[in-house]
């Protein structure tokens, strides 16, 4: 599963409880800055590397493209497939399409998701999928 923009909604207690529950259920996760930035799962004998990003505190930051591509390259070296997931982009009906520019939500930079995705592909990602904020 992906650690993303809501992981800190209930502070460190909620975050720790979520991580504990994932461990107990033997569910792999990635995207938690400095703790579990990437994960590798094995399915049908294939190593699948997963890294996840968002613009929020305690997550691996989508705004640091250099670091993101470093993680992707690291996974590429040891995995058969590399998957990148990210939460980014603006919010609201005016953001229904990718702008190819930096987008903001409530004053917070959500990054340039077009640039981010292409950088991850160039670094070796096999699949990049993104999701954004709720439409209002």
Residue ranges and their predicted role:
Residues 1-136:
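Acidic, metal/ion-coordinating pockets
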